[in-house]
């Protein structure tokens, strides 16, 4: 019976390693100090569609009223977030930028297109704690691209100036993103680029400087949330290793004992020995959900209780450094009842289960995180 108890305890301890990773508190660190899991290549993609107004800042255009210089500019982009705070995007911008010749308020049309690869930096996710349901994000970006002016026309529709002008561009911008749902965001974006497309109205300067302000929607594709990589609590791992090694030594010692029994002494009044087997279920912080890697502890205890017709006492706890005493009492109650429910699932009759909860009023271990537990005691 002692060997069975030791093996049961050894199996329970061997299943607690993955639970230790869930006890760390790195979820409260800024994104720059947090590592995230690599997801599938198809995850974290997005498409943005927007429209707004644009104008050219350079040359004689500045002599014309602000409103008269505004033209309609659509944008379309496709991109991917490689981290919660870093992404890349290929955006297409173009249509018409108005230009004004020297001394004239006659509106000329510069028909152009601009494709640019942007490097996006989410300041909110970088300097703040990552939250998948955060409503507001500030995202500056910079990029390089290719610009092409098809041709220019005057107010009468006659082609003027040069055509088929190609140039490299330097692009910068700022996006303000508002979360509407898991898959849709609303964006307000301002951007500008520098390139030499020979727009009408630029005085034949060294570069054209169009600016644009747009509003639109982003559609998120695939998985949108990020999962943190939580480091292991190595102090707890070492302690569990020591306990496992100690139990292995005891099992090895028992296995070396001779099978044959010595001569029995004269019969005496038998002494009843009460065998008590404890097992533990570890929980994540602020959670009463039993992780899959902890279910084996509940299963082993249930099997032991059924085999030995033993009652089970279930006691829930919470750590004292998280939450109030009243909240921890409720949390420990939910944990204890969750374990009792799973014991019933594995075949233990409800009338053989006693449930108690201590909240954070009693701390079994000096290590704070180790007290997020339910202790199961099966006694013959």
UniProtKB/Swiss-Prot annotation:
GO terms for cellular component: cell outer membrane; outer membrane. Residues 270-380 form the OmpA-like domain. InterPro entries: Bact_OuterMem_StrucFunc, OmpA-like, OMPA-like_CS, OmpA-like_sf. It is found in: Cell outer membrane. Keywords: Cell outer membrane, Disulfide bond, Membrane, Pyrrolidone carboxylic acid, Signal, Transmembrane, Transmembrane beta strand. It holds the Pfam family OmpA. The modification Pyrrolidone carboxylic acid is found at residue 22. GO terms for molecular function: polysaccharide binding; porin activity. Disulfide-linked heterodimer with Omp41. May have porin activity and function in peptidoglycan binding. Belongs to the outer membrane OOP (TC 1.B.6) superfamily. This is Outer membrane protein 40. It comes from Porphyromonas gingivalis (strain ATCC BAA-308 / W83).
């Amino acid at each position: 019976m002692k060997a069975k108890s030791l093996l049961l305890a050894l199996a329970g301890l061997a299943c607690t390693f993955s639970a230790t990773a869930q006890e760390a508190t790195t979820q409260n660190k800024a994104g720059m100090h947090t590592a995230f899991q690599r997801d599938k290549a198809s995850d974290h993609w997005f498409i943005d569609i927007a429209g707004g107004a644009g104008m050219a800042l350079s040359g004689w255009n500045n002599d014309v009223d602000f409103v008269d210089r505004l033209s309609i500019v659509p944008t379309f982009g496709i991109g991917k977030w490689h981290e919660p705070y870093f992404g890349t995007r290929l955006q297409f911008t173009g249509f018409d930028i108005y230009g004004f010749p020297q001394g004239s308020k006659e509106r000329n049309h510069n028909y152009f297109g601009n494709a640019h690869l942007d490097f996006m930096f989410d300041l909110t996710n970088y300097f703040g704690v990552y939250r998948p349901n955060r409503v507001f994000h500030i995202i500056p970006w910079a990029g390089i691209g290719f610009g092409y002016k098809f041709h220019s026309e005057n107010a009468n529709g006659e082609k003027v100036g040069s055509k088929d002008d190609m140039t490299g561009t330097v692009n910068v911008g700022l996006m303000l993103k508002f979360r509407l749902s898991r898959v849709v965001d609303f964006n307000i974006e301002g951007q500008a680029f520098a390139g030499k497309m020979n727009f009408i109205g630029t005085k034949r300067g060294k570069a054209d400087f169009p600016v644009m302000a747009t509003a639109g929607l982003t559609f998120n594709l695939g998985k949108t949330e990020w999962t943190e990589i939580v480091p292991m609590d190595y102090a707890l791992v070492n302690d569990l290793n020591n306990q496992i090694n100690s139990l292995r030594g005891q099992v090895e010692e028992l296995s070396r004992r001779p099978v044959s029994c010595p001569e029995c002494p004269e019969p005496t009044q038998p002494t009843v020995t009460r065998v008590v087997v404890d097992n533990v279920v570890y929980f994540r912080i602020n959670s009463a959900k039993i992780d899959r890697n902890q279910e084996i502890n509940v299963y082993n205890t249930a099997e032991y209780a059924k085999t030995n017709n033993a009652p089970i006492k279930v006691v829930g706890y919470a750590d004292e450094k998280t939450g109030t005493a009243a909240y921890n009492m409720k949390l420990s109650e939910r944990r204890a009842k969750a374990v009792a429910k799973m014991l019933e699932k594995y075949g233990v009759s409800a009338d053989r289960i006693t449930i108690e909860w201590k909240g954070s009023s009693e701390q079994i271990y000096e290590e704070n995180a180790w007290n997020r537990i339910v202790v199961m005691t099966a006694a013959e």
